[in-house]
Design a protein with these regions (language model features):
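Conserved PLP-dependent catalytic core of the aminotransferase class-I/II
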Residues: 66, 157-181
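A short glycine-threonine-serine/GTX helix/turn-capping micro-motif
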Residues: 124-125, 142-151
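Conserved Walker B
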Residues: 6, 58, 86-88
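Active-site PLP attachment segment
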Residues: 102-137
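Active-site phosphate-binding strand-loop segment of PLP-dependent enzymes
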Residues: 23, 27-83
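Conserved PLP-anchoring active-site segment centered on the Schiff-base-forming lysine
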Residues: 1-9, 179
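Short, structured coil segments at secondary-structure junctions
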Residues: 17-19, 109
């Protein structure tokens, strides 16, 4: 696992639970990221396995954008998977509010996308989007998912209404207003 040195604590905790090698790169530093990916690639060539790069779309503490467009260039060069935590970008970034990967035009290159309802939707809960095989694995193997209760229907209905707003002309206007503040 390769991740930004200033990734959110939940991402760092998740990475620490992984049994494999973990490597960090300097915060939002393209050259450091590439050097770390090169090291990870050499290690994978020696031992087998693959690389998962974990980053954030918008860093919550600073508001800085992750360099997703450049990370996708590295992905094409070094053949790894990308997980993006876009809790702060979902609903706010991109022409239709689909997040930071939409903002950079790289949505189809993101392998796992994590969004939260707590930020732009002022609610609770979140989601993971990705290939069906991976999502099914998560659904049936994550203890936090297996023993969790579903969201209350009022929150689900409220979330659907908020998604309608995000996708509407009003949502477009609200996103424009957000960036003028």
């Amino acid at each position: 696992i390769v991740y930004d040195s200033e990734a959110h604590a939940c991402l760092i905790d998740g990475a620490r639970m992984h049994m494999g090698k973990r490597m960090t790169y300097r915060h939002n530093d393209y050259e450091s990221c590439e050097k770390t990916i090169q090291r990870a690639t050499r290690l994978c060539e020696e031992t087998g396995g693959g690389i998962l790069l974990i980053t954030e779309g918008v860093y919550g503490m600073t508001g800085a954008l992750g360099f997703l467009d450049k990370i996708v260039e590295l992905k094409k060069k070094y053949k790894f998977r990308i997980l993006i935590d876009d809790a702060h970008g979902f609903g706010n970034m991109g022409p239709t509010g689909r997040g930071t990967s939409e903002h950079f035009g790289v949505m189809d290159e993101i392998d796992l996308y994590i969004g939260a309802y707590a930020k732009s939707m002022a609610s609770i809960g979140g989601f993971v989007a990705g290939p069906k095989k991976i999502i099914n694995y998560l659904r049936f193997n994550m203890r936090s998912q297996i023993y969790a209760k579903s969201l209350p229907m009022a929150l689900v209905e409220g979330g659907l209404k908020r998604l309608e707003i995000i996708r509407s002309k009003e949502g477009d206007e609200l996103r424009q207003k957000l960036f003028t503040i």
